[in-house]
Each structure stands twice: as structure tokens, then as C-alpha cells.
Design a protein with these regions (language model features):
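Catalytic-core elements of nucleic-acid end-processing and repair enzymes
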Residues: 452
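Short glycine/threonine-rich loop-to-helix capping motif typified by GTGT followed
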Residues: 398, 424-428
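Surface segments flanking catalytic/ligand-binding clefts of nucleic-acid enzymes
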Residues: 440
Length: 532
């Protein structure tokens, strides 16, 4: 009996110790301090507004009138109807809180000064980002529909379509990493890296050692990381450590615990450019879980593409724009110093048409979503889609359902093990309507699917960073590669079909048999999805 009591006592001590460890980890986490600081500010603002409203009946009436005027203003804005509905409901249900939240978080445009700097850089580089007439004519003669899709990207995103480029597709980060290391080691003139998340570990330390060596050799090594994406993964002022190693480094929109709408806009892009003619992009960040060196949410399924050739120029210009804007440089960029042919002898191989592009919250154009919609609307046989999050607006829902009802084989693959449970519940709330229209949905059972890709009709595809959710489509800086009649199209399709073997196909009964409480919660989340 005494031994049994000692065992129970020991288990209790271990449980208490574990609880204290978790509590200490939370308290000393930077996210904890940021969250507390922001909640205190929001609480203080709300308390002041409520006190004013309680102090005077006229102030209370005035605040409610402001809410009504604000609703009318929102309804007449040229924004996505889903945003209009979400904000209108919030303001009408909770007038005072809704008004406060809208003025703090509601406007999606980035800071005016940043917008001005981007527009200046885009205008400055215009002459270096023109379609080659012979390339455009060739694509037009080959497929007018594909040419129209490409022309939209050229005209709106400002990045031209290219030939003289090859592509290699990677089914998982485990395959991409050794190739990335090999190419980095061969760098002669410059390495430009821009990522949303960097985390210390096998992947980053391997890359960092190469970057340090290359910087010592005189290679121009530059790095951009996102202030929020790396909030918990890198030390405070990590850029100073890198600069001591000879690596030029800038932080996009450093995250500060201040209520500010600008904090909504993040740099979600993932770019690695080497000597102007080798470029990587896709869903893979620089952290061990992306190459399955660390287990998080089961097996991590992600994809990437490596380009070699003239199309890498688009990526280089994207990076140079971002670098100049973050640094608030007033000097003109010497674009000719970074041309692809400058550091590559001979001609590039050519395989189809390749067009890297970016999407920004700088304007009212949702380039990423429009590129996806173009593919769906023009599909004749099939569209296969990979996305970690499925939180879509009415336009995307209508396009997917219409394509399926028109006989197009529409398949969507999502994670089986989520990284964010709330977002996963919201993702699953869209299943029923899609299934009823004939869309097939698959959940990747071994773990977390983080890939973002479209492929259609054995001819056209996109690989990049753009998720099917509101944050990616409306608030973040993103990038992708539009690909036409390149051999990687077949690779993307084959990967999707092979991955289906590890998926569970979702049947209509899955949605119908969910408990009523969960379905009510999903409906509430759906109403406010654009704000999440």
C-alpha cells in the first residue's frame, strides 16, 4: 500500500512539474507578451469608448449613428462581398465593439508610404518587365485561351511570360533540400533569399553555414524574413547576428505589440534566387518540419519548383523591389547588373512557357485568386488542387461548383492532420456545398498537407505560396509560378494522383453526420471567416 501511495504521489509531482514547465514556457514566450499587450490596448480602447457612451446618452447615440454610417460606407466600398457581410454583421450585432474593431483592424490597405515606394519601384522597372513580342505571339498562336490568362498576369502583376526556362518539381521538401544546398554552394555572384518563416535547426544551420561561406568569398548575400512569421522562431534582432556574418538582412514589417492595421499585411513569399538564373519557390519555409527532420502534425507534405533560365528574372525583380522598399532606399536599382544572362554562359534550355508572378495588397486586384479562377473557368477535363486551408469566397465557390456541374473533374486535397484546429473546422464547413456540386475532396491522412498547387488538362499549372484563404488572397504578399506545357505539369498531376492513395475521400455522409453543435459553430465561423 505504501509503495502504491508513493507511486501516486510521484505521478502527481511529475504532473505538477509538467504543468509548471508548460506555464513557464508560455510566460516566457514572446507571443504571450505580444498577446497580452495587444489585449490590454484593445481593452483600454473599448473601456474608454464604453465609459464615454455610459457618461452621456448623446455620446451613446452618436456612436451608434457612427456604426450605421460605417455600415453604409462599407456596403458601398469596392471590396469582396464576404468582407462586407462579415463587418456589417459584427457592427450591427455589437455596435460599439464592432466600430472599434473596424477602425483598428478593418482596413486592409498597407501604409501609404510603403504603397508609394512600391509604386515607384514598379514604375522604375517597367521597361525591364515587358513581354517579348515573339514569345507572346508564339503563345497566342499555340493557345489563345492560355495566352489570355498569361496576358492578365503581365498586364496586372507586371511580370512577363518567358521561354528559355526549365523547371523541376519537388513532391516533398525532403527532395528539394539537397538540390537547394547544391545550388547554393555553386553561387558565384549573388544569393537573394526571402521567406516567411525561418527556424533554427538542421535545415537553417546548413543553409546559414553556406551563406556565411559565400559572403566571405565576396558573394552578395541578402536575406528578408517576415517579422511575424519569425516572431517565435528567431531571436529578437536576429538580423544583427546575420549582418556580423557578412549577410545583408532586412525584416519585413517587424511585429510590434501595437494595435495597427499594418500588422495584418505579411510577406508570405518564399523565394531563393541564385546568380539570377536559378530560382526556387513553393510552400516550403526554412524550418525542419518542412523537410521532415522534425515531426509536427504527422508527415509534412509540401511542394516546390526550381526554375533555371530567363523566367528567374521575374523573381529577381520581386526581391529587389521588396529589398528597396523595406530599406526605404531612394537610389535607383541597377537592374542590368542582375540580368540572367550576365552570369550564365550560353543559351538556356527551353521547355514551354513559365511566368513567375506576385500578388500584393497594394491594389484592388486579387491576382492570385484571379489566376486560380482563370484556370478553373477555362478547364475542359480536370482541375486538381492542393491547399492547406479552404476558406473561400462566393466567387471561388461558384467557379468550383460550376466547373464540377459542367462535367469537369474537380478534386481538392486538404490536410488530414491540421496545424490550426479552428481553421480546419472552418475548412470542413465548405465541404458540403462542394460535394453536392460534384467536387471530390480528399484529406491527406499521414499528416499535414502544406502544398499550394493547381494543375489542369495536362497543360497548365501553378505552384507557389498562395493558399485558398482570405489572408493569402487579400492581405499578404504572395508569389506563384504560372506554367504552360512544361514537363513539370505531368509531374504535378502524377504527384496528386499518387498522393490520393494516402488520402481519405470525403463522402456527403461525413457532413450530414456531424453533430448539431459543431455544425452551428461552423456556420458562425463561416459568417466571420474573412475576419479570421
Amino acid at each position: 500500500l505504501k509503495a502504491e501511495n508513493n507511486k501516486i504521489l510521484k505521478e502527481k509531482k511529475n504532473w505538477i512539474l509538467l504543468l509548471f514547465k508548460k506555464l513557464a514556457k508560455l510566460i516566457f514566450n514572446r507571443i504571450f507578451y505580444v498577446a497580452v499587450a495587444m489585449l490590454v490596448q484593445l481593452g483600454w480602447i473599448l473601456m474608454m469608448v464604453l465609459r464615454l457612451a455610459a457618461y452621456s446618452r448623446y455620446i451613446d447615440i452618436g456612436l451608434r449613428l457612427i456604426g450605421i454610417v460605417l455600415v453604409l460606407w462599407i456596403l458601398n466600398k469596392e471590396i469582396n462581398p464576404s468582407y462586407k457581410l462579415a463587418w456589417t454583421m459584427l457592427i450591427l450585432i455589437l455596435p460599439i465593439l464592432g466600430v472599434v474593431l473596424y477602425f483598428v483592424f478593418g482596413r486592409s490597405r498597407i501604409a501609404a508610404i510603403m504603397q508609394q515606394h512600391f509604386e515607384q519601384r514598379i514604375e522604375e522597372s517597367r521597361e525591364y518587365l515587358r513581354d517579348r513580342p515573339q514569345t507572346r505571339q508564339k503563345l497566342e498562336a499555340l493557345d489563345p485561351s492560355a495566352s489570355n490568362q498569361s496576358r492578365y498576369i503581365s498586364d496586372v502583376s507586371r511580370f512577363p511570360v518567358h521561354e528559355n526556362t526549365t523547371a523541376e518539381y519537388f513532391q516533398v521538401g525532403d527532395d528539394m533540400f539537397p538540390v537547394l544546398v547544391r545550388e547554393l554552394k555553386q553561387a558565384k555572384k549573388y544569393i537573394f533569399i526571402e521567406y516567411f518563416i525561418i527556424n533554427d535547426g538542421v535545415m537553417w544551420q546548413t543553409i546559414l553555414n553556406i551563406l556565411e561561406e559565400k559572403a566571405a568569398e565576396g558573394v552578395d548575400v541578402r536575406l528578408i524574413y517576415d517579422g511575424f512569421g519569425c516572431l517565435t522562431t528567431l531571436p529578437h534582432k536576429y538580423y544583427e547576428e546575420l549582418q556580423k556574418k557578412g549577410i545583408k538582412c532586412q525584416v519585413f514589417n517587424p511585429f510590434r505589440p501595437i494595435l495597427n492595421i499594418i500588422q495584418n499585411n505579411r510577406d508570405h513569399r518564399k523565394l531563393c534566387i541564385i546568380d539570377g538564373w536559378v530560382g526556387f519557390t513553393g510552400g516550403i519555409n526554412l524550418a525542419d518540419e518542412y523537410i521532415n527532420q522534425k515531426a509536427r502534425f504527422g508527415h509534412w507534405k509540401d511542394t516546390a519548383v526550381m526554375l533555371k533560365g530567363e523566367a528567374v528574372w521575374n523573381m529577381t525583380v520581386m526581391f529587389l523591389h521588396m529589398w528597396a522598399v523595406i530599406g526605404r532606399s531612394e537610389e535607383s536599382i541597377d537592374y542590368e547588373a542582375y540580368f540572367p544572362h550576365r552570369y550564365h554562359e550560353g543559351e538556356f534550355e527551353s521547355d514551354g512557357f513559365v511566368q513567375p508572378f506576385c500578388d500584393t495588397p497594394l491594389d484592388e486586384e486579387v491576382v492570385g485568386e484571379d489566376v486560380y479562377l482563370n484556370i478553373i473557368n477555362k478547364a475542359k477535363k480536370y482541375v486538381y488542387i492542393c491547399t492547406p486551408y479552404l476558406i473561400i469566397d462566393n466567387e471561388m465557390m461558384t467557379a468550383l461548383c460550376l466547373a464540377a456541374k459542367s462535367g469537369v473533374d474537380v478534386r481538392i486535397m486538404t490536410p488530414g492532420i491540421p496545424d490550426k484546429k479552428l481553421v480546419f473546422i472552418l475548412t470542413q464547413s465548405y465541404y458540403r456545398q462542394l460535394l453536392e456540386a460534384g467536387v471530390k475532396i480528399y484529406e491527406y491522412q499521414p499528416g499535414f498537407l502544406h502544398a499550394k498547387s493547381f494543375v489542369s488538362d495536362d497543360e497548365i499549372g501553378v505552384v507557389g505560396t498562395i493558399n485558398l484563404d482570405y489572408r493569402s488572397l487579400y492581405l499578404h504578399f504572395e508569389d506563384g509560378v504560372w506554367i504552360y506545357r512544361n514537363r513539370v505539369i505531368q509531374d504535378i498531376k502524377d504527384d496528386f494522383i499518387q498522393t490520393m492513395e494516402y488520402c481519405r475521400q470525403i463522402e456527403p455522409e461525413f457532413c450530414l453526420n456531424r453533430n448539431i453543435g459543431l455544425r452551428i459553430m461552423q456556420n458562425i465561423f463561416r459568417a466571420f471567416a474573412p475576419l479570421m
